Amino acid sequence: MATAPLRRSLSLWQVSLSGIGVILGAGVYALIGPAAGQAGNALWLAFVLAGLTAGLTAYAYARLARLAPRNSPEFQYTALAFGARPGFVAGTLMLLADVLAAATVTIGFGGYLEHLAGTPTVVNALALTVALGAILWLGVEQSIAVAIVLTGLEALGLLLVIAVGMPSWPATDYLTAPRGLTGVSSAAAIIFFAYLGFDELGNFAEEMRRPDRDLPRALLISMVATTVIYVLVALSAVAVVDAERLGASAAPLALVVGRVLGKHADMVLSLLALAATANTVLLLLAASARSIYGMAAAGVLPARLAHVGRTAVPVDATVLVLTVQAVLVVVGTLRQVAAITDAVVLVSFMFVNASLCWLAARHRTPSRGGRRIAETLIPSLAFVLCAWLLLHAGLASLLSAAGLMVVLVLLGSLSSIPHMGYRR
């Protein structure tokens, strides 16, 4: 079955803003509380550690994007280095993580809306899934346009948190960490979820006008911008509300704003959180569908999933993602669905970092001299940091990720993946 190409229409600024949108997203709104409970006033340091891990991994994505600027980057990059079977494992792990993350945030949206309107969480989550499905069907440009508007709203909420906390910065001791390095590392493992999204930019490679030039730039822009915002949010949050109280709050950032500006500001921030959660889900669903498209086009998933509709959207892949998402939000809880996401993502990132290190060491990248050394050392450090955070992700998450790895390795061994036409 012939694979129809996607339409190349996205510019650098469109992809950069969508990257900022999916990274900023809902994770920080919900997870900054539990992270503060672990790290204390040194919460900012946990964001730096998580951001450093994500940023060094983003370097691997940026370098590898020049070699394989195609959708489903985890599959493409790992397969380029180690073959299609490991690529299948890495790509499918990230695909599962994306769908799990989208379901997690959708349930979070449902909870926020239930708090404001009183309608059941599951009904709200399903309604959001249907509404975003309609937006996705319109096409990638329309989806990105909606995402850019929502990105502005979610950034406004975080800037509000920063502003209300700035006057209290000088009086705050930012080195107080009751649990020391262990607490900071555990907090970094928790809030690593808030950095997920930069990797999704690779799933828009086949719809970018100049992916070889613009994809690495978009990765750099989105990572730097979001890390700066996150650190400033962390500084303000613990300056206004005690870290222990943040850890016990279901809506920590709303608590921060409400403490300074009153209960009406609390409601405003909750509305902005709805925009943040909706934006994250929209971009995760769009990226997940294109990841499936990329793997189907490469021959490791059924060719039908590479079918492109009249709006230049991978229709069957999108329907599959929406269906799985709907099932997850009905049968799962926020904690159940979110439990393994970080661990699965960290394992997939380890595959990507190992891929760049291996390709550079074997002189299979076009770089020379110092740049080739950097392509070996930087992903090696990122690999170690990913492993460090993985060890602090919790036993249940580790066991779940290990179980998925075993299942995918068995599926890859029993299938005919090497003969499915993977294109290097």
Regions found by a protein language model. Give the residues of each.
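Hydrophobic transmembrane alpha-helices that form the core helical bundles
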Residues: P34-Q38, G55-T129, A134-Q142, T151, ...
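A generic transmembrane alpha-helix motif of multi-pass inner-membrane proteins
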Residues: V344, R372-R424
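TM-loop-TM module centered on a large, flexible mid-protein loop between adjacent transmembrane helices
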Residues: Q76-A79, G83, E114-T119, L220-L285, ...
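Small-residue-rich segments of transmembrane alpha-helices in multi-pass membrane proteins
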Residues: S18-A26, T151-V164, S222-Y230, V352, ...
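Transmembrane alpha-helical segments of multi-pass small-molecule transport proteins
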Residues: F47-L49, L116-V140, L158-V161, V315-V324, ...
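Membrane-interface "cap" regions at the ends of multi-pass membrane proteins
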Residues: M1-L31, Q38-A42, G55, Y59, ...
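Helix-loop-helix junctions that connect adjacent transmembrane segments
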Residues: A2-L6, L43-W44, G118-V123, A127, ...
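Helix-loop-helix connectors at the membrane interface of multi-pass transporters/channels
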Residues: M1, A79, V105-A125, E207-D212, ...
